């Protein structure tokens, strides 16, 4: 029994000894590095060397320099163990001289795998790592040299584009100023043409209404004349019966009536109501008969007047007798003109107007209501008209309107006493009517100094001025259709030109408000689109407008232009088409230095959120070029690293 206990005790002691030896071996394999600052980045060296007591970066506790890289984790964030694998959250910095530095998790230190090209992560000697940084860095240095060359060339292009942007902006500003000036002048001309067009349309409308009125009155007069003619025929039959009866009974006929009685009856016709017309025995019973049928008594009176006039002319050679004879002859002529006018206009005048007209020729009284007989021109009046200029006030009252009746009178030549107006009067009158429509724009333009090769605006000004002079709304003839059409055509063309100018002004104003960068380096982007074909899609990015994804004939809007972001490193497009059951589409375009504008690497890293890269000379910055040159210089000045055989 005692022997068994002793043997068990010996067995346990051997196991413990083995475990202690194993722990000692493990302890020696993870021994601290010879360099206490191994694994610390150059940026953090000052933090560790500033004092003898170091504070954990998370602020939890402090540790001494002796505790730094002692292979025991004192800080939960691994601040005290950057060069060992003691802390799971620690970071190890590979310097990789001659190549690019690398940061590793501390758990990969002394794990038997060479992670750093300089072999610094396997310092315990269990693995021999060759230093391959110089060879590996050779390709990186070549790429860096190419990148520097791209920046150099791109910087030259960028400077050129900046100069072109300055010129372009100045040109845009000058064009905007010129267009605004032209807009002001052209708007004045368009306003003048619009006023004249509206005036012409008013006159045309007035003429149209007057023509409709006259046609209506003419139809009413024709209807009344037809009705009156029927009444006259009935009354004529009655009158003939009365005359036959009077002849059979020996009663004197109408021809036996005294001239004075006939004068009194007709002269006092207007004293009777229209529905109580006097009807003398043996005379016509209507005024229409008086106007349309020749009265024997009237012929007798005219013949007697002519005979008395001729006898008085022969028997009285004195001046006074001659004057009396001339006056009677003129009176006879006037009577004849009235008779002729009545014959011509009998269908257009009402019964009442015919009655007044016939009565007035005997009594010498004028009707209270003016008739067309008042328009019969007199020789003396025509002579006075030829030598009496029309005043502006009279022209305004006339309003430039001429009825169709006046047109017929002048065209038919029935009253050819009118003579053509003096040409000098027409020119003087036309000049006066044009000056009333002169605007401020006319005062600003001197057409006498127009060059032999005038601009389009000067041509328009001259054309409008000629039109305004040619179209005279106060003339005594109806509106000339060809001139009216000319005004409308010029108004339409000038209005179209004005709209184009206003559209261009709006476009320029919007353009000049855009953000073209601190040095206007993105000015050349305005109005340009960049495309990239990737798979079945074609991506199109238009600066200051929109970005789209196209497939065949379908187009998806990825976003509208928003702004530049992160110091002009990105172009942002937002508020695109909504994704099904998702957000609105958007796009961010990363800008990088390149010798030409080229869109590439379009991707969708998140649902409906797109990303792309655009190379452009606009991003070849001088500060970035200096940074790259310094980096290359540092790499080239490094000595060729030695192999870590001693490790």
Curated annotation (Swiss-Prot):
<keyword id="KW-0611">Plant defense</keyword>
<feature type="coiled-coil region">
    <location>
        <begin position="155"/>
        <end position="235"/>
    </location>
</feature>
<dbReference type="Pfam" id="PF12999">
    <property type="entry name" value="PRKCSH-like"/>
</dbReference>
<feature type="disulfide bond">
    <location>
        <begin position="529"/>
        <end position="542"/>
    </location>
</feature>
<comment type="pathway">
    <text>Glycan metabolism; N-glycan metabolism.</text>
</comment>
<comment type="subunit">
    <text>Heterodimer of a catalytic alpha subunit (PSL5) and a beta subunit (PSL4).</text>
</comment>
<dbReference type="InterPro" id="IPR036607">
    <property type="entry name" value="PRKCSH"/>
</dbReference>
<dbReference type="InterPro" id="IPR044865">
    <property type="entry name" value="MRH_dom"/>
</dbReference>
<dbReference type="Pfam" id="PF13015">
    <property type="entry name" value="PRKCSH_1"/>
</dbReference>
<feature type="compositionally biased region" description="Basic and acidic residues">
    <location>
        <begin position="326"/>
        <end position="355"/>
    </location>
</feature>
<keyword id="KW-0256">Endoplasmic reticulum</keyword>
<feature type="domain" description="MRH">
    <location>
        <begin position="527"/>
        <end position="622"/>
    </location>
</feature>
<feature type="compositionally biased region" description="Basic and acidic residues">
    <location>
        <begin position="363"/>
        <end position="388"/>
    </location>
</feature>
<dbReference type="GO" id="GO:0042742">
    <property type="term" value="P:defense response to bacterium"/>
</dbReference>
<dbReference type="InterPro" id="IPR039794">
    <property type="entry name" value="Gtb1-like"/>
</dbReference>
<dbReference type="InterPro" id="IPR028146">
    <property type="entry name" value="PRKCSH_N"/>
</dbReference>
<feature type="compositionally biased region" description="Basic and acidic residues">
    <location>
        <begin position="230"/>
        <end position="268"/>
    </location>
</feature>
<dbReference type="GO" id="GO:0009536">
    <property type="term" value="C:plastid"/>
</dbReference>
<feature type="region of interest" description="Disordered">
    <location>
        <begin position="206"/>
        <end position="453"/>
    </location>
</feature>
<keyword id="KW-1015">Disulfide bond</keyword>
<comment type="function">
    <text>Regulatory subunit of glucosidase II. Essential for stable accumulation of the receptor EFR that determines the specific perception of bacterial elongation factor Tu (EF-Tu), a potent elicitor of the defense response to pathogen-associated molecular patterns (PAMPs). Required for sustained activation of EFR-mediated signaling, but not receptor FLS2-mediated signaling elicited by the bacterial flagellin flg22.</text>
</comment>
<feature type="compositionally biased region" description="Acidic residues">
    <location>
        <begin position="395"/>
        <end position="410"/>
    </location>
</feature>
<protein>
    <recommendedName>
        <fullName>Glucosidase 2 subunit beta</fullName>
    </recommendedName>
</protein>
<dbReference type="GO" id="GO:0005783">
    <property type="term" value="C:endoplasmic reticulum"/>
</dbReference>
<keyword id="KW-0175">Coiled coil</keyword>
<feature type="compositionally biased region" description="Basic and acidic residues">
    <location>
        <begin position="290"/>
        <end position="308"/>
    </location>
</feature>
<feature type="compositionally biased region" description="Low complexity">
    <location>
        <begin position="311"/>
        <end position="320"/>
    </location>
</feature>
<feature type="signal peptide">
    <location>
        <begin position="1"/>
        <end position="30"/>
    </location>
</feature>
<keyword id="KW-0732">Signal</keyword>
<dbReference type="InterPro" id="IPR009011">
    <property type="entry name" value="Man6P_isomerase_rcpt-bd_dom_sf"/>
</dbReference>
<feature type="compositionally biased region" description="Basic and acidic residues">
    <location>
        <begin position="206"/>
        <end position="222"/>
    </location>
</feature>
<feature type="short sequence motif" description="Prevents secretion from ER">
    <location>
        <begin position="644"/>
        <end position="647"/>
    </location>
</feature>
<feature type="disulfide bond">
    <location>
        <begin position="579"/>
        <end position="608"/>
    </location>
</feature>
<feature type="disulfide bond">
    <location>
        <begin position="593"/>
        <end position="620"/>
    </location>
</feature>
């Amino acid at each position: 029994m005692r022997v068994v206990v002793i043997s068990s005790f010996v067995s346990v002691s051997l196991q413990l000894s083995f475990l202690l030896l194993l722990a000692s071996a493990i302890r020696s394999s993870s021994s601290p590095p010879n360099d206490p600052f191994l694994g610390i980045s150059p940026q953090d060296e000052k933090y560790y060397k500033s004092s003898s007591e170091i504070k954990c970066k998370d602020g939890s506790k402090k540790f001494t320099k002796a505790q730094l890289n002692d292979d025991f984790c004192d800080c939960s964030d691994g601040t005290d163990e950057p060069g060992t694998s003691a802390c799971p959250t620690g970071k190890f910095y590979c310097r990789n001289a001659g190549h690019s530095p690398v940061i590793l998790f501390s758990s990969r230190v002394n794990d038997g795998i060479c992670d750093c090209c300089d072999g610094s992560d396997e310092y315990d000697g269990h693995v021999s790592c060759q230093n391959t940084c110089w060879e590996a860095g050779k390709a990186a240095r070549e790429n860096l040299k190419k990148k520097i060359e791209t920046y150099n060339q791109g910087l030259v292009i960028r400077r050129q584009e900046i100069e072109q942007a300055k010129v372009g902006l100045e040109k845009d500003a000058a064009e905007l100023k010129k267009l605004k000036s032209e807009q002001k002048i052209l708007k004045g001309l368009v306003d003048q043409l619009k006023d004249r067009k509206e005036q012409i349309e008013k006159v045309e409308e007035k003429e149209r209404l007057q023509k409709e009125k006259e046609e209506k009155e003419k139809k009413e007069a024709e209807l009344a004349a037809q009705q009156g003619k029927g009444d006259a025929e009935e009354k004529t039959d009655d009158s003939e019966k009365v005359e036959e009866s009077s002849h059979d009974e020996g009663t004197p006929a109408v021809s036996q009536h005294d001239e004075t009685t006939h004068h009194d009856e007709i002269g006092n016709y207007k004293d009777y109501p229209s529905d109580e017309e006097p009807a003398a025995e043996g005379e016509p019973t209507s005024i229409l008969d008086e106007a349309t049928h020749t009265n024997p008594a009237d012929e007798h009176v005219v013949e007697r007047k002519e005979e008395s006039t001729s006898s008085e002319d022969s028997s009285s050679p004195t001046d006074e007798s001659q004057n009396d004879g001339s006056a009677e002859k003129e009176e006879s002529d006037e009577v004849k003109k009235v008779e002729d006018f009545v014959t011509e206009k009998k269908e257009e005048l009402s019964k009442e107007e015919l009655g007044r007209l016939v009565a007035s020729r005997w009594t010498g009284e004028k009707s209270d209501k003016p008739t067309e007989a008042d328009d019969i021109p007199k020789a003396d009046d025509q002579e006075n008209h030829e030598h009496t200029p029309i005043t502006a006030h009279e022209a305004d009252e006339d309003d430039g309107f001429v009825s169709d009746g006046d047109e017929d009178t002048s065209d038919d030549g029935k009253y050819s006493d009118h003579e053509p107006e003096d040409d000098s009067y027409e020119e003087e009158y036309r000049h006066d009517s044009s000056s009333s429509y002169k605007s401020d724009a006319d005062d600003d333009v001197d057409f006498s100094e127009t060059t032999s090769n005038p601009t389009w605006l000067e041509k328009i000004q001259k054309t409008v001025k000629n039109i305004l002079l040619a179209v005279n709304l106060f003339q005594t003839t109806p509106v000339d259709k060809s001139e009216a059409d000319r005004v409308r055509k010029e108004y339409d063309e000038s209005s179209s030109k004005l709209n184009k100018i206003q559209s261009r002004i709006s476009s320029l104003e919007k353009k000049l408000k855009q953000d073209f960068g601190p040095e206007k380096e993105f000015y050349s982007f305005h109005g340009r689109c960049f495309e990239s074909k990737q798979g079945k899609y074609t991506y199109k990015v238009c600066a200051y407008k929109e970005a789209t994804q196209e497939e065949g004939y379908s187009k998806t809007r990825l976003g509208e232009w928003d702004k530049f972001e992160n110091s002009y490193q990105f172009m942002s497009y937002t508020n695109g088409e909504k994704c099904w059951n998702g957000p609105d589409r958007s796009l961010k375009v990363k800008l990088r230095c390149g010798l030409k504008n080229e869109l590439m690497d379009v991707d969708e890293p998140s649902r409906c959120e797109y990303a792309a890269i655009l190379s452009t000379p606009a991003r070849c910055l001088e500060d970035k070029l200096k940074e790259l040159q310094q980096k290359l210089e540092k790499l080239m000045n490094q000595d060729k690293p030695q192999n870590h055989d001693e490790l």
